[in-house]
């Protein structure tokens, strides 16, 4: 009998302990689920763009370097979405914040930044969405360009390296 009373008191103690926790806040979780967006193709998960060797004299009158294309390949696109835009982000240049800064170093070029252009060769400012690209079923290549541009009149030769990430936004 004593064991039964102890057991009941033990269970009551557990119940009372649970009531000691206070309700301090609420977490509301929401979102949306879309079927049939696109899959980023394996060859587009890491893209390397070679700008090549560009003569320093090319920039002497504010001219730009040549555009070098790169492609983001989407595949298995379904019919639930019709467009995609792309936002590129990275370290902005200190003078022209809409362009990528060149990584610093003892042998790095200076006075230049890297512009990212859409398929019509129009500048896409960093951290801003590109124009909308139409999607269709199957594989969809999205063409972009990287281009060296002077940001001041004191352009110095050297290595040019920069990194950017991109995010796809579907509609």
Swiss-Prot record:
<protein>
    <recommendedName>
        <fullName>Uncharacterized fimbrial-like protein YcbV</fullName>
    </recommendedName>
</protein>
<feature type="signal peptide">
    <location>
        <begin position="1"/>
        <end position="17"/>
    </location>
</feature>
<dbReference type="InterPro" id="IPR036937">
    <property type="entry name" value="Adhesion_dom_fimbrial_sf"/>
</dbReference>
<keyword id="KW-0732">Signal</keyword>
<dbReference type="GO" id="GO:0043709">
    <property type="term" value="P:cell adhesion involved in single-species biofilm formation"/>
</dbReference>
<dbReference type="InterPro" id="IPR050263">
    <property type="entry name" value="Bact_Fimbrial_Adh_Pro"/>
</dbReference>
<dbReference type="Pfam" id="PF00419">
    <property type="entry name" value="Fimbrial"/>
</dbReference>
<dbReference type="GO" id="GO:0009289">
    <property type="term" value="C:pilus"/>
</dbReference>
<dbReference type="InterPro" id="IPR000259">
    <property type="entry name" value="Adhesion_dom_fimbrial"/>
</dbReference>
<dbReference type="InterPro" id="IPR008966">
    <property type="entry name" value="Adhesion_dom_sf"/>
</dbReference>
<comment type="function">
    <text>Part of the elfADCG-ycbUVF fimbrial operon, which promotes adhesion of bacteria to different abiotic surfaces.</text>
</comment>
